[in-house]
Swiss-Prot record:
Entry annotation: catalytic residues: 14 (proton acceptor), 42 (proton donor)
Family per similarity comment: Belongs to the adenylosuccinate synthetase family.
Protein known as: Adenylosuccinate synthetase
PANTHER family noted in UniProt: ADENYLOSUCCINATE SYNTHETASE
Catalytic activity: IMP + L-aspartate + GTP = N(6)-(1,2-dicarboxyethyl)-AMP + GDP + phosphate + 2 H(+)
Superkingdom of origin: Bacteria
A molecular-function term among this protein's GO annotations: GTP binding
Cofactor(s) required, per the database record: Mg(2+)
Sequence positions that bind substrate: 295-301
UniProt pathway annotation: Purine metabolism; AMP biosynthesis via de novo pathway; AMP from IMP: step 1/2
GO cellular component, one term: cytoplasm
Binding site for Mg(2+): 14, 41
Organism field: Campylobacter jejuni subsp. jejuni serotype O:23/36 (strain 81-176)
Length: 416
């Protein structure tokens, strides 16, 4: 019996998980998404061609991989169908859990309307309806992908839901679709998606029993976890390794190696605490060189220095076996590079994450920069200062680096 390896982001998302998964996919039979929705975005570069994936696992770019969208994901049929249209021959290579919850048009309308009402206190969501979809799931009023197999019945259930919540929709100025419009959409979803809908948990159990190689692909980052992130500025699902198992129906004994994906600096989209944010020239330089624009939202990411306190925290949360250090090349040409080794909090120096992270100040140490690592594929060819930087990050995080990315391209990766 084999075990499922897990790839997990350990900052605020956008760490480069897609590139790592894409690089590793050739060694796996199954690649699986476990949580989130189309608020997540993976960018993968292959031979100069850019692929942006939001719902589909990154294994879709490898013909031998079977790709699974698990029960913990909230699925927008509209978005998924559009994404599927980019690829050929998906039959037998893509499966969607019949237990995954649906993310429908009204969810995004609710999301946008509620954010608008909050004004300056808005969370800074993607507006994709992810929170409202998970809210329906927790309230036990949601609908699941398996219900698409009976579109007439699902349509009737949704119309009843809309009528029961008519006052709520009117307050948010959201127009309720007609039964005819809704049924037409559901029938279209049914026609296209039915061949892909199945019990993916049983499929994975069988795969592990048959010693197949399985990779679980995390979405977003551990600092956005609903329980362990910077609440309330978090996502609506569990983004840590334990959540990856839950979101696919696997048990803790079925977890294999856990690899944490981390940028050589730090970024964050939206509002919320971000201790190492640099609002000056260095932060702007990182943003420009790193092309730090959100894949799903098009929003500019906030940029700053490596936060070793946060990474050490998320390394423990996830039980990491190794790190994959991404976008090291973005720091090429910096004379000095900062690392946050601790925080100042209420007059004390601390090395942990308090629940009110917005009240800390970073304590930095500086290291000498380097000229260029871009495109290097051999560790021995890295500049000495880059090697020292990597060694210091390992020391502060308490986890060894196994992979180093030196450009957006798939093959520009050092494996240690």
């Amino acid at each position: 019996m084999s075990k499922a390896d897990i790839i997990v982001g350990i900052q605020w998302g956008d760490e480069g998980k897609g590139k790592v998964v894409d690089k590793l996919c050739e060694n796996y039979d199954f690649v699986c998404r476990s949580a989130g929705g189309h608020n997540a975005g993976h960018t993968i570069w292959v031979n100069g061609v850019r692929y942006a994936l939001h719902l589909m696992p990154s294994g879709v770019l490898h013909p031998r991989c079977i790709n699974i969208i698990g029960n913990g994901v909230v699925v927008s049929p509209e978005v998924l169908i559009a994404e599927m249209a980019q690829f050929e021959n998906l039959k037998g290579r893509l499966y969607i859990s019949d237990r995954a919850h649906l993310n429908l048009k009204h969810h995004s309308l609710i999301d946008i309307a509620k954010e608008k009402l909050k004004g300056k206190n808005a969370i800074g969501t993607t507006g994709k309806g992810i929170g409202p979809s998970y809210a329906d799931k927790i309230n036990r009023t949601g609908h699941r992908v398996g219900e698409l197999l009976e579109p007439q019945r699902l349509c009737e259930a949704l119309i009843k839901d809309f009528e029961a919540n008519k006052t709520f929709f009117e307050m948010l100025e959201i127009e309720i679709p007609s039964a005819e419009e809704l049924l037409a959409d559901l029938k279209r979803f049914n026609e296209i998606l039915t061949p892909y809908i199945t019990d993916t948990t049983r499929m994975l159990w069988k795969a592990l029993d048959e010693d197949k190689r399985v990779l679980l692909e995390g979405a977003q980052g551990s600092m956005l976890d609903i329980d362990h992130g910077t609440y309330p500025y978090v996502t609506s699902s569990s983004t840590i390794s334990a959540g990856a198992l839950t979101g696919l129906g696997l048990n803790p004994k079925e977890a294999g190696n856990i690899i944490g994906i981390v940028k050589a600096y730090a970024t964050r989209v939206g509002n919320g605490a971000f201790p190492t944010e640099d609002k000056g020239e260095d932060g702007e330089k990182i943003a420009q060189i790193g092309k730090e624009i959100g894949v799903s939202t098009g929003r500019k990411r906030r940029c700053g220095w490596f936060d070793a306190v946060a990474v050490r925290y998320t390394a423990r949360l996830n039980g990491l076996d190794a790190l994959s250090l991404m976008k090291l090349d973005v720091l090429d040409g910096f004379e000095k590079i900062k690392i946050c080794r601790a925080y100042e909090y209420k007059g004390m120096e601390i090395d942990y994450i308090p629940s009110d992270l917005e009240n800390v100040q970073p304590i930095y140490e500086e290291m000498d920069g380097w000229d260029k690592v871009f495109g290097i594929k051999d560790y021995d060819l890295l500049p000495e200062n880059a090697k020292k930087y990597i060694a210091r990050l390992e020391e502060l995080a308490g986890v060894k680096v196994k992979y180093i990315s030196t450009s957006p391209e798939r093959d520009d990766t050092i494996i240690l």
